[in-house]
């Protein structure tokens, strides 16, 4: 089977989307399928092309068996103007058409959304190749844009995105969703049961695992012998990480505790300013690390935290970081409702509090820090849940079965 994967981000970039896709493409290649990835030059999240890829218009490389076709496009960081971001999204479309065309005839086109714009060349390439189209929803656009206040429902940009969304759903042979709530939403938008499939998020349990608390990578940070409350991932708008900073302020009396936010994103400068304004000395920031080093950083955490803004749309999502925390045997305190809260409860690996409630988050964190036994029990339960239900290997095998089903229908067998 020949499969074309289309994504604006891909390894060696870091983030939820590359972390979801890379194990999927690796699994397909290891099982004898020809996998092509049409993408751009790696630049996420800073918008600066990585050093080894600069000065090139097109390049072809192999990553764990997958043939990665990269074309240069206009790149920009997330914290610049919306016009610059839109230009970046739009410039990717001819780039991915170029890369996708070079892949030659394929049996299936697998495109991830968001961003939603690559669905346009994906639809065209699927038609040109006579291939089946699988649309993979790891978030919902334009719902997320409205949820974080970046645009108003009914505005001209959102109307355009809604039109692309409708075309994408009509054109897809299968729509895969990371959560049940997403599947329910697309059902309401006319995607029939025969098209909908659940392809949830998870973690690479061989990479994200329990490691020695004291290790050379974690030792690069000035934690000392303090207990560490850690957030690891994108410092984005939808995460409402001001709540984590406020929780740190409520625990400033604990000299044995430090909060650590590891990652980059459009809210980092604002969060650092918040820490300065509050005069906090118990909050540290750290930038991106290669994905293979992240579990060693997480190993130093005593409690992991996450949060999402209190919005009905965001109740439908579960961040990849939640599964990575659990896989590393870390107890989780999440400012989460809906799907995220359900995962914490179902796994037994965490405590859900109301999004944006810094007092509740601080109380839950304090309780776990004061109970090593509870932390250990939650850590073991969380790891067990991910291994049994949300391993990337299990999810990749599910995708392989789905592709076989779809392409066999295509071939009339």
For the regions a language model picked out, list residue spans one by one:
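Membrane-proximal helix-turn-helix segments that form the acceptor-binding/catalytic region
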Residues: 97, 117-120, 124-129, 155-177
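Nucleotide-activated donor-binding/catalytic signature segment of Leloir-type glycosyltransferases, i.e.
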Residues: 255, 268-295
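Acidic anion/phosphate-binding donor-loop and adjacent secondary structure
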Residues: 187, 193-194, 203-219, 240
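Short hydrophobic beta-strand element within catalytic cores of glycosyltransferases
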Residues: 303-306, 324-335
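Conserved donor-binding/catalytic core segment of Leloir-type glycosyltransferases
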Residues: 223-248, 260
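Carbohydrate-associated surface elements
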Residues: 181, 202
């Amino acid at each position: 089977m020949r499969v074309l994967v289309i994504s604006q981000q891909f390894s060696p970039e870091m983030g939820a989307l590359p972390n979801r896709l890379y194990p999927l493409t690796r699994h397909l290649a290891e099982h004898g399928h020809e996998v092509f990835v049409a993408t751009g030059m790696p630049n996420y999240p800073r918008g600066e092309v990585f050093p080894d890829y600069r000065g090139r218009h097109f390049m072809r490389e192999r990553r764990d068996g997958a043939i990665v076709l990269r074309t240069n496009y206009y790149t920009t960081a997330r914290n610049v103007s919306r016009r610059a971001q839109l230009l970046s999204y739009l410039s990717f479309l001819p780039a991915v058409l170029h890369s996708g065309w070079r892949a030659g005839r394929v049996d299936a086109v697998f495109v991830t959304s968001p961003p939603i714009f690559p669905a346009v060349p994906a639809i065209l390439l699927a038609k040109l190749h006579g291939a089946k189209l699988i649309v993979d929803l790891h978030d919902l656009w334009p719902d997320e844009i409205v949820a974080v206040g970046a645009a108003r429902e009914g505005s001209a940009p959102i109307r355009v995105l809604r039109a692309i969304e409708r075309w994408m759903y009509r054109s897809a042979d299968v729509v895969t969703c990371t959560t049940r709530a997403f599947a329910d939403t697309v059902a309401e938008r006319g995607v029939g049961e025969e098209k909908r499939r659940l392809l949830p998020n998870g973690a690479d349990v061989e990479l994200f695992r329990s490691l020695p608390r004291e290790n050379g990578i974690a030792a690069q940070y000035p934690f000392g012998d303090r207990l560490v409350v850690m957030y690891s991932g994108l410092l984005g708008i939808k995460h409402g990480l001001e709540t984590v900073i406020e929780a740190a302020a409520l625990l400033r009396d604990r000299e044995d505790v430090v909060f650590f936010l590891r990652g980059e994103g459009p809210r980092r400068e604002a969060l650092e300013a918040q820490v300065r304004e509050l005069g906090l000395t118990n909050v540290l920031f750290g930038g991106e690390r290669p994905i293979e080093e992240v579990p060693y950083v997480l190993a130093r955490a005593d409690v992991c935290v996450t949060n999402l803004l209190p919005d009905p749309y965001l109740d439908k999502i579960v961040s990849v970081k939640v599964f990575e925390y659990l896989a590393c045997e870390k107890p989780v305190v999440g400012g989460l409702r809906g799907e995220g809260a359900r995962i914490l409860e179902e796994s037994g690996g965490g405590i859900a509090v109301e999004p944006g409630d810094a007092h509740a988050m601080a109380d839950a964190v304090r309780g776990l820090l004061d109970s090593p036994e509870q932390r250990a029990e939650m850590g073991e339960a969380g790891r067990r849940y991910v291994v049994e239900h949300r391993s990337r290997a299990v999810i990749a095998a599910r995708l392989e079965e789905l592709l076989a089903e779809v392409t066999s229908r295509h071939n009339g067998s």
